[in-house]
Amino acid sequence: MSEATVNDKKKKGIQKVRIGYVVSDKMQKTIVVELEDRNQHALYGKTIRTTSKVKVHDENETAGVGDRVRIEECRPLSANKHFRLVEILEKAK
C-alpha cells in the first residue's frame, strides 16, 4: 500500500460531547450555551463549580432559551464558534 492512499483517509479526532443550558438565542444560527464543570480544590477538597459560555452552531434555529442541549466539538466555524448542536434533550418549561 502506498503512502498516498494511507494519507487520503483523514482521521477524525475524538470530539468532546458536552451537555449544557441555552442562555441566549438572539443571533442567527448561533446559540450561547453555558457549560458547568465541577472540580475539587487540591488542598482543601471543597467542590468548586465553574461555568463557561460557548457559542454553538444551530443550523435550524430550533433551540430556545432554557433548553437543555447536547453539543459536540467540531472544526472552527467562525472566530468564536467551535461547537455544533447535536440534539435538544429537554425543552424549557
Curated annotation (Swiss-Prot):
<keyword id="KW-0694">RNA-binding</keyword>
<dbReference type="GO" id="GO:0003735">
    <property type="term" value="F:structural constituent of ribosome"/>
</dbReference>
<keyword id="KW-0687">Ribonucleoprotein</keyword>
<dbReference type="InterPro" id="IPR000266">
    <property type="entry name" value="Ribosomal_uS17"/>
</dbReference>
<dbReference type="InterPro" id="IPR019979">
    <property type="entry name" value="Ribosomal_uS17_CS"/>
</dbReference>
<comment type="subunit">
    <text>Part of the 30S ribosomal subunit.</text>
</comment>
<dbReference type="GO" id="GO:0022627">
    <property type="term" value="C:cytosolic small ribosomal subunit"/>
</dbReference>
<comment type="function">
    <text>One of the primary rRNA binding proteins, it binds specifically to the 5'-end of 16S ribosomal RNA.</text>
</comment>
<dbReference type="InterPro" id="IPR019984">
    <property type="entry name" value="Ribosomal_uS17_bact/chlr"/>
</dbReference>
<keyword id="KW-0699">rRNA-binding</keyword>
<dbReference type="GO" id="GO:0019843">
    <property type="term" value="F:rRNA binding"/>
</dbReference>
<dbReference type="GO" id="GO:0006412">
    <property type="term" value="P:translation"/>
</dbReference>
<dbReference type="InterPro" id="IPR012340">
    <property type="entry name" value="NA-bd_OB-fold"/>
</dbReference>
<protein>
    <recommendedName>
        <fullName>Small ribosomal subunit protein uS17</fullName>
    </recommendedName>
</protein>
<dbReference type="Pfam" id="PF00366">
    <property type="entry name" value="Ribosomal_S17"/>
</dbReference>
<comment type="similarity">
    <text>Belongs to the universal ribosomal protein uS17 family.</text>
</comment>
<keyword id="KW-0689">Ribosomal protein</keyword>
